């Protein structure tokens, strides 16, 4: 019902109930209509107080994306930054500090893929991380070489050269890699089988399936 959807969207945090606690409380509510003077608390009823496992910050972001398509808590890529740093991937905020022709590696969630018919096979991709956006240019030969990674990725890593024209910065892709598997590390239970056997965590979703696919335009 409506209350359950609000709980799943983490709408009760302002009254001290996080998503998991709110869903637990909502599950105890009756679906039957209650009269005006009925359903009052009874001193004779002792509810069992359970300590539910806390959802991690990353887990909350996953759930936010699953229910509302975005999160105001944090950007998903921020939880992967240490892993990306080990791959020498820099935040998009560093792009303006580079010089034309510098080699760079960036990664982010794909928001747009665009392959205009007038562009002679060139693919334009926009990715976003916790710092901002990066505009990528993928030439036809590179696209054919990395087609599967580009088409299937939610989280894409690109290595290439910086191209600066006035205030506009592009990354000309040399190679593209699908890093969507890293999104799974954001789950509270990395092993999906554990979630099936743990009732208190049955609300968890697969992060790799939650984050939006890029929009495709021609």
Q: Where are the regions that the model predicts?
A:
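Sliding clamp-binding short linear motifs
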Residues: 1-97, 161-163, 169-216
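Structural detector for short beta-strands of small beta-barrel domains
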Residues: 103-117
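Residue-level "contact hotspot" at macromolecular interaction interfaces
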Residues: 97, 103-104, 149
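Hydrophobic, well-ordered secondary-structure elements that form the walls
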Residues: 68, 108, 127, 153, ...
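OB-fold (S1/OB) nucleic-acid-binding surfaces
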Residues: 116-141
């Amino acid at each position: 019902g409506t209350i359950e959807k609000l709980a799943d969207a983490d709408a009760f945090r302002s009254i001290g109930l996080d998503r998991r606690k709110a869903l637990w409380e909502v599950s105890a509510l009756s679906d039957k209509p209650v009269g005006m003077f009925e359903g009052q608390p009874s001193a004779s009823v002792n509810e069992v107080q359970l300590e539910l496992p806390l959802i991690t910050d990353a887990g909350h972001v996953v759930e936010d994306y699953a229910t509302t398509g975005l999160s105001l808590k944090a950007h998903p890529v921020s939880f992967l930054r240490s892993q990306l740093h080990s791959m020498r991937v820099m935040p998009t905020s560093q792009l303006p500090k580079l010089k034309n022709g510098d080699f760079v590696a960036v990664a982010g969630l794909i928001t747009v893929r665009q392959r205009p018919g007038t562009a002679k096979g060139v693919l334009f991709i926009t990715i976003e991380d916790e710092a901002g956006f990066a505009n990528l240019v993928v030439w036809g030969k590179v696209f054919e070489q990395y087609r599967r990674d580009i088409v299937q990725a939610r989280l894409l890593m690109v290595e290439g050269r910086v191209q600066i024209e006035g205030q506009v910065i592009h990354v000309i892709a040399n190679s593209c890699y699908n890093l969507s598997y890293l999104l799974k590390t954001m789950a509270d239970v990395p092993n999906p089988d554990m979630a099936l056997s743990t009732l208190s965590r049955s609300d968890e979703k697969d992060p790799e399936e939650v984050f939006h696919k890029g929009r495709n335009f021609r």
